[in-house]
């Protein structure tokens, strides 16, 4: 098995918690097709194992959870297939989108530790998990528009569920937001200092797991809500400007929106 995703199971009483750690620090844990396949395969396997009560997804290192798809690998594959079809890119996106759907529909508790850079495909993973931890250095964005792509990986679902016109604003400007903003617009559910990760994982392992999805989900929610963050939230960037954002993003005429921005 590839070491680009570290697969582990750690004890939680007489059960286990699965853990998937994106392990490509040099590329800020950017997703490759191989990584997507490992994540999907493990999630599907754990879904059918009663002893696995939850899954934690995090990233190696202190800089990033995941900077998105490995654009360099996608570019290289297209150069190698001038004029197309580009099998690598087609397979990558097809598999990535299936992985996103699997995350959104996963029955067991999914806890994502979204520290540092969380961009594009990384945000797709975070948004698909039920329990979405953000930290003091979380930096979230959907930068696809800057490379002539569109906000994918479930963006049409989670962007449209944000307050006001924030989803459209993030999609059209590729602006970055912090943990406070993530909590405000629903991309984050819990805030902790990054250095608390190990203690949070240990607390999860200490829960009285029942192998009952509904009961276990309630317990995870209660546990995470009961832990106090060791750092203060960063200053809000979205909420203070929601009226302006709504005004700029109003209507269906994109040219008019761009003129206002």
Question: Over which residues does each language-model region extend?
Answer:
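Conserved CoA-thioester-binding segment of acyl-CoA-metabolizing enzymes
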Residues: 1-58, 101
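Catalytic-core regions built around general acid/base machinery
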Residues: 42, 95-106
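Contiguous mid-protein beta-loop-alpha structural module that forms a pocket-lining wall or clamp
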Residues: 154-214
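Hydrophobic/aromatic residues within transmembrane alpha-helices
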Residues: 57, 70, 125-126, 181-182
